[in-house]
A protein has these predicted regions:
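Histidine-acidic metal/acid-base catalytic patches
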Residues: 1-121
């Protein structure tokens, strides 16, 4: 299990740790922070600069590279408190759609990785 936000707290990017874990990685806790506080915000909240946010494209690429087929767990409950109570269902839908988007990127990159591997044989 790796935690994207906790990796950010030591000013690193999760992609390196994902590749090191390889096939042993079965669960990824996904959330965003500002690299200074463990804020548990939804992915992309702070952009994708290496100084402040998670590089989500590199993360998706690393997951594709290792053939990840585990669980993506979104630890984003604290971000719910940032929105008015009446909008929470929509916020949950947005978090879900972000998850679908990231999973789609992983799937596309995985397919490209397989195709390139076949071509290079």
């Amino acid at each position: 299990c790796l935690d994207t936000g906790h990796i950010q707290l030591v000013h690193r990017q999760p992609a390196d740790y994902i590749r090191k874990a390889g096939s042993r990685l079965k669960l990824l806790h996904m959330h965003e922070n500002d690299a200074y506080g463990d804020l548990h915000q939804m992915p992309y909240t702070f952009g994708s600069s290496k100084e402040c946010g998670t590089d989500w494209d590199s993360l998706a690429s690393a997951l594709a590279d290792i053939g990840f087929d585990g669980t993506l767990s979104f630890e984003t409950f604290p971000c719910m408190n940032s929105f008015p109570y009446g909008t929470r269902d929509e916020v949950l839908r947005t978090i879900h759609e972000v998850g679908v988007y990231i999973k789609g990127k992983i799937d596309v990159l995985s397919e490209q990785f397989v195709q390139n591997s076949v071509k290079n044989k």
